[in-house]
């Protein structure tokens, strides 16, 4: 993998990420395609309508169903999903943490029960990489020990040491495999404890293709999250991409870009879309509300998305009220377009050395009203 840093504006960065299946401009927002597709959308929607170059799929879910061997036999995720861009796959540690209810941490991995049928499984650092090799992921995440916040200091330290050990084992295993098209990212843990974050960086070997800031957006305040990012990002190698996992709102993303983060993913645009919340440059709207019943205007004037060029708020209001499946697609296309345009505009502002004024102008308008 080749990462070219093209411009820095204060701490905000613009770059190019060259992967086996695509060239990705950063900062980048990755739509979440947990099961190998973005909910309610297909590969044509992702590629041709949204122009997405990099989406996230989940190792835990693809392993349990349909199984990584099935995907591998069918040519990997790209052929299976007919997506010509790139895939980043999470290690599955977060899902084992959040879905199984009663995981058992061992020194060699995580024992968890399937949320589908209750069967027991063991994820080890090597096992999750083998799964991701079968999926043929462009970017693979190492297995980590995630801690919900708040957490005792002793538990945080345990998590850091275990995560660093697993990351370093993963790196050694990956080197033996000699698969340069499958890139490996480490994950930095430590909750909101800044000394623990520094320890996590110090324990994690150099030589990874990128570094993620994990363990945030799991119960801490926004101020704590931003303080943690501000502390951690400068500790990471300047010549490698930095990925903030699972974050977040438009405000969170712009704040994190300003702190030196390059990559983001979050279910918010699609989940909010399915639940009637749509993003506009002057704030969020709830399309289910009565005032939109006769509103013949698009979600946002001058929006170039597929939905706004064709349909009115009144039509979307009707589809949501009628529980039509088409609603989820049209709403998701709009919200994802909003997010992708946001990071694209942020990138252009960084290249033109005007990121802070861009962010200020965006937030002033965005926070002006929500209805």
UniProtKB/Swiss-Prot annotation:
Region (RNA binding): 246-252, 270-274
Keyword line: Glycosyltransferase, Metal-binding, Queuosine biosynthesis, Transferase, tRNA processing, Zinc
Molecular functions per Gene Ontology: metal ion binding; tRNA-guanosine(34) queuine transglycosylase activity
Cofactor (UniProt): Zn(2+)
Enzyme Commission no: 2.4.2.29
A family per Pfam: TGT
Active-site residues, as the UniProt record annotates them: 90, 265
Domain of life of the organism encoding this protein: Bacteria
UniProt catalytic activity: 7-aminomethyl-7-carbaguanine + guanosine(34) in tRNA = 7-aminomethyl-7-carbaguanosine(34) in tRNA + guanine
Gene Ontology biological-process entries: queuosine biosynthetic process; tRNA-guanine transglycosylation
Keyword tRNA processing appears in the UniProt entry: yes
Cofactor comment text: Binds 1 zinc ion per subunit.
Principal EC category: transferase
Entry binding sites for substrate: 90-94, 144, 189, 215
One GO term describing the cellular component: cytosol
Known pathway: tRNA modification; tRNA-queuosine biosynthesis
Family membership: Belongs to the queuine tRNA-ribosyltransferase family.
HAMAP family: Q_tRNA_Tgt
Functional note: Catalyzes the base-exchange of a guanine (G) residue with the queuine precursor 7-aminomethyl-7-deazaguanine (PreQ1) at position 34 (anticodon wobble position) in tRNAs with GU(N) anticodons (tRNA-Asp, -Asn, -His and -Tyr). Catalysis occurs through a double-displacement mechanism. The nucleophile active site attacks the C1' of nucleotide 34 to detach the guanine base from the RNA, forming a covalent enzyme-RNA intermediate. The proton acceptor active site deprotonates the incoming PreQ1, allowing a nucleophilic attack on the C1' of the ribose to form the product.
Assembly mode: Homodimer. Within each dimer, one monomer is responsible for RNA recognition and catalysis, while the other monomer binds to the replacement base PreQ1.
PANTHER family assigned to the protein according to its UniProt record, in alphabetical order: QUEUINE TRNA-RIBOSYLTRANSFERASE CATALYTIC SUBUNIT 1 (PTHR43530:SF1)
Annotated protein name in UniProt: Queuine tRNA-ribosyltransferase
Organism: Helicobacter pylori (strain HPAG1)
Gene name of the record: tgt
């Amino acid at each position: 993998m080749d990462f070219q840093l093209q411009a820095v504006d204060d701490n905000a960065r613009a770059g190019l990420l060259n992967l086996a299946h695509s060239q990705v401009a950063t900062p980048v927002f990755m739509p979440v395609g947990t099961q190998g597709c973005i909910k309610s959308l297909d590969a044509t929607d992702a590629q041709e309508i949204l122009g997405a170059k990099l989406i996230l799929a989940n190792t835990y879910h693809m392993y349990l169903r349909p199984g990584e061997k099935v995907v591998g036999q069918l040519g990997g995720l790209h052929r299976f999903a007919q997506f010509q861009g790139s895939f980043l796959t999470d290690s599955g540690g977060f899902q084992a943490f959040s879905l199984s209810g009663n995981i058992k941490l061992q020194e060699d991995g995580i024992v968890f029960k399937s949320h589908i049928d209750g069967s027991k499984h063991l994820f080890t650092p090597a096992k999750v990489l083998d799964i991701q090799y079968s999926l043929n992921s462009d970017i693979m995440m190492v297995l980590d020990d995630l801690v919900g916040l708040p957490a005792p200091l002793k538990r945080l330290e345990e998590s850091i040491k275990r995560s660093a050990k697993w990351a370093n084992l993963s790196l050694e295993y990956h080197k033996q495999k000699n698969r340069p098209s499958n890139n490996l990212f480490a994950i930095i843990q430590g909750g909101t404890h800044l000394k623990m974050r520094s320890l996590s960086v110090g324990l994690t070997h150099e030589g990874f293709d990128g570094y993620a800031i994990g363990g945030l957006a799991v119960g801490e305040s926004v101020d704590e999250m931003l303080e943690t990012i501000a502390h951690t990002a400068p500790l990471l190698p300047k010549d490698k991409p930095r990925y903030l996992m699972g974050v977040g709102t438009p405000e969170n993303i712009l704040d994190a870009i300003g702190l030196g983060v390059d990559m983001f993913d979050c279910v918010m645009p699609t989940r909010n879309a399915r639940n009637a919340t749509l993003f506009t440059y002057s704030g969020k709207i709830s399309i289910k509300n009565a005032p939109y019943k006769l509103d013949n205007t698009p979600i946002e004037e001058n929006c170039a998305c597929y939905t706004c060029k064709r349909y009115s708020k009144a039509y979307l209001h009707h589809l949501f009220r009628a529980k039509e499946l088409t609603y989820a697609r049209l709403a998701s296309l709009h919200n994802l377009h909003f997010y992708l345009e946001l990071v694209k505009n942020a990138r252009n502002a960084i290249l033109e050395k005007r990121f802070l004024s861009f962010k200020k102008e965006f937030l002033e308008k965005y926070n002006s009203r929500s209805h």
